[in-house]
Curated annotation (Swiss-Prot):
Cofactor or coenzyme needed: Fe(2+)
PANTHER family in the cross-refs: TRNA N6-ADENOSINE THREONYLCARBAMOYLTRANSFERASE, TRNA N6-ADENOSINE THREONYLCARBAMOYLTRANSFERASE, MITOCHONDRIAL
The keyword Acyltransferase belongs to this UniProt entry's keyword annotation: yes
Family matches, as Pfam families: TsaD
Cofactor binding, note field: Binds 1 Fe(2+) ion per subunit.
EC number of the protein: 2.3.1.234
An example molecular function term from Gene Ontology annotations: iron ion binding
Origin superkingdom: Bacteria
Protein name per UniProt: tRNA N6-adenosine threonylcarbamoyltransferase
Organism listed in the record: Paracoccus denitrificans (strain Pd 1222)
Length: 356
């Protein structure tokens, strides 16, 4: 009896090298992620050259480990899916070249996957969510509202015009002397903080639509920090905690209000969130409340599938393959690759890869 499709997924768009084996019944047989946090810790952010070299060193090992965990050989697979963009081009190229080599050597079908589609389709993998649904994709390099109508049918309703939220979290952590990655550090510090102590702005809430901006909020945190340092000669731990709590509350409030507008603009039975910042519990709580107001179900992936992983790439590859997609040896690595080809290009570029 047929076991259905089984795909290998390969992900290397930023600072996580990953491989996974996934079946079309939504079973994740293996998911391997080799992070690079230690390599970039001294630089306050991801260094593209260091990331690319690390991907080149780890990709084949991750694939071997994923196959071993799944108890499969390459000959047991039905296809290979690989992130072909958007992202840091050196890492994306490493993954694409490995996938091409494996496809050429085995004769397996090759499917190039948009990294953002991997995040956007994660609710299909984790919960079997039917189309359509509204997706808030919120990560280190990207932030956009998408109506998802199919594996390659996305309508962008709005997005960030400057920094992505994850980038803002990283920069605020750096300003306050907290370790990277900034998201978990800021969230941890905020638990002991008073979000009401500092009057931080809620950017673009006075303008209609679903576009977002976070660079002014980051600058406001910088000003408050500098005022505290000038007044008392440094920052106390409570100062850091209060600044983190205020910043986190501002981000959550902005995203909640813009999500409310997106649901009004494109009503959907399900509101989903994905991307690394979707792991933030304050944000999840705010989005859950917005979904309840609109009579929608709120879904967020398990934390291990919020951040970059190859299981989502394998799944997106399966969906694209079932829709008739095939790629050849001319598959190109793309630093920019908008999900909604009809929408105007987003402004700016995030630290973790080009906006799309």
């Amino acid at each position: 009896m047929s076991m259905g499709l089984t795909f290998l997924g390969i992900e290397s768009s930023c600072d996580d090298t990953a491989a996974a084996v996934v079946r079309d019944d939504r079973s994740i047989l293996a998911s391997v992620v080799a992070g690079q946090a230690a390599l970039h810790a001294d630089f306050g952010g991801v260094v593209p050259e260091i990331a690319a070299r690390a991907h080149a060193e780890k990709l084949d090992l991750c694939v071997e480990e994923a196959l071993a965990q799944a108890g499969l050989r390459l000959s047991d697979l039905d296809g290979i899916a690989v992130t072909a963009g958007p992202g840091l081009i050196g890492g994306v190229l490493s993954g694409v070249m490995l996938a091409k080599g494996l496809a050429a050597g085995t004769g397996l079908p090759l499917v190039g996957v948009n990294h953002l589609a991997g995040h956007a389709l994660t609710p299909r993998l984790t919960d079997g969510t039917p189309y359509p649904y509204l997706m808030l994709l919120v990560s280190g390099g990207h932030c956009q509202f998408l109506r998802v109508d199919g594996p390659e049918d996305f309508t962008r309703l709005g997005g960030t015009i400057d920094d992505a939220p994850g980038e803002a979290f990283d920069k605020v952590a750096k300003l306050l002397g907290l370790p990277q990655p900034g998201g978990p550090s800021v969230e941890a510090a905020a638990r002991a903080g008073d979000a009401r102590r500092f009057a931080l702005p809620r950017p673009l809430l006075d303008r209609p639509g679903c576009d977002l901006s976070f660079s002014g909020l980051k600058t406001a945190v910088l000003r408050q920090r500098d005022e505290l340092v000038a007044a008392q000669g440094g920052l106390h731990e409570q100062d850091r905690a209060d600044l983190c709590a205020g910043f986190q509350a501002a981000v959550a409030e902005v995203l909640a209000e813009k999500t409310r507008r997106a649901l009004a603009l494109a009503p959907a039975p399900v509101l989903a969130a994905a991307g690394g910042v979707a792991a933030n519990q304050t944000l999840r709580t705010a989005l859950q409340a917005v979904a309840a107001e609109a009579g929608a179900t709120f879904l967020a992936p398990p934390l291990r599938l919020c951040t970059d992983n190859a299981a989502m790439i394998a799944w997106a590859g399966i969906e694209a393959y079932e829709a008739g997609r095939r790629d050849g040896m001319d598959l190109a690595a793309r630093p920019r690759w908008p999900l909604d080809q009809r929408a105007a290009p987003m402004l700016g570029a995030g630290k973790r890869g080009a906006k799309a």
